Regions:
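Cytosolic regulatory/linker segments at or just downstream of nucleotide-handling modules
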Residues: 211, 240-290
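Alpha-helical scaffold within the catalytic cores of cyclic-nucleotide enzymes
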Residues: 132-148, 164-204, 229-240
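A short glycine-enriched loop-to-beta-strand structural element that forms part of the catalytic core
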Residues: 160-161, 198-214, 249
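HAMP signal relay modules and closely related sensory coiled-coil linkers
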Residues: 27-73, 105
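Catalytic NTP-binding/metal-coordinating core of nucleotidyl cyclase/transferase enzymes
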Residues: 97-176, 224
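Membrane-proximal coiled-coil signaling linkers
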Residues: 73-110
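Cytosolic-side ends of inner-membrane transmembrane helices, especially those
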Residues: 13-29
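Membrane-interface helix-start motif
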Residues: 1-10
């Protein structure tokens, strides 16, 4: 016969075991919920992972958490080399890497530092690198704030574009980004001088046109970019600022697309290098408030 004492001990063991199972299940459930939540975050390009703050001791869960962190870190690093909108499009299957270029109406943006070669000769390499990092940060932040895509850096120049997402307001947003860049660069100049660098002036060209946009390259290396005559025009507008004494040169096609919301000064018809037909151009001065 089983004594009453043994029954009590058996019931106590069962109760403790059940309590431990419940605690373990709850703890496991919390970790699973955390990993599921973090997967949702990564899919929406939010890289602040909760599981990194609350690591599990269970081997299988640790493996899952480590794999999730590798995925998050990889996407975050990838997004620094490729426009975030492109990475998101690839991950969400909105961008087909095998698809040919598509024609779209975009607003093209080129920004370049005036007299960069001379500046590079006058200040140390260390100070130049720090100033260039500030410059690129200012330009990229302004472009991204206005919903644009930073395409590439070309030496000290930045190429960006708007309109891939179907936003019809892209000419105004590009103009607003250009004005932000000029304003912020001007505000940054005193700090550069204080740190032993030099003041910088930037030139910007804006043009709205139908161009080809998409992935192009070789089987081993692709680039998501815009190509076409409109891209060349935007680059020429940026360079034309030097001859015209302007800071932001825009085309008539962009001006007409903004519906009279821009404050401009007419530059008349100008002939650009490599083009036979002159274009009506304007200097962008500001935005007309409603």
């Amino acid at each position: 016969m089983v004594s009453a004492g043994m029954n009590r001990d058996l019931l106590l063991v069962i109760a403790v075991s059940l309590s431990l199972i419940v605690i373990f299940a709850r703890n496991l459930g919390k970790h699973i919920e955390g990993i599921s939540s973090d997967f949702d975050k990564v899919s929406s390009f939010n890289f602040e992972l909760d599981t990194a703050k609350n690591p599990s001791r269970l081997k299988e869960m640790v493996t899952l958490q480590q794999g999730l962190k590798v995925l998050s870190d990889s996407l975050q690093a990838f997004s620094r080399f490729v426009p975030i909108a492109v990475v998101r499009g690839i991950v969400n299957n909105d961008i087909d890497l095998n698809q040919k270029l598509n024609e779209k109406r975009l607003t093209l943006f080129f920004c370049d530092i005036s007299g960069f070669t001379a500046i590079a000769e006058r200040i140390s390499s260390e100070k130049l690198v720090l100033q260039m990092q500030d410059f690129f940060e200012i330009v990229c932040q302004a472009v991204e704030e206005e919903g644009g895509t930073v395409d590439k850096f070309i030496g000290d120049a930045v190429m960006a574009f708007w309109g891939v997402d179907g936003d019809l307001d892209h000419p105004v947003r590009a103009a607003r980004a250009a004005l932000k860049v000029q304003d912020r660069i001007q505000n940054q100049c005193p700090l550069w001088i204080e740190l032993g660098g030099e003041a910088m002036q930037v030139r910007i060209g804006l043009h709205t046109a139908d161009v080809l946009v998409g992935t192009i390259g070789s089987p081993t290396r692709l680039n998501y970019t815009a190509i076409g005559d409109g891209v060349n025009v935007a680059a020429r507008l940026e360079a034309l600022n030097k001859d015209l004494g302007t800071k932001i040169c825009i085309s008539d096609s962009l001006f007409q697309a903004t519906g009279g919301t821009l404050q401009v000064r007419s530059l008349g018809y100008q002939t650009m290098r490599g083009r036979h037909e002159p274009l009506l151009l304007y200097e962008l001065l500001g935005l007309i408030s409603n």
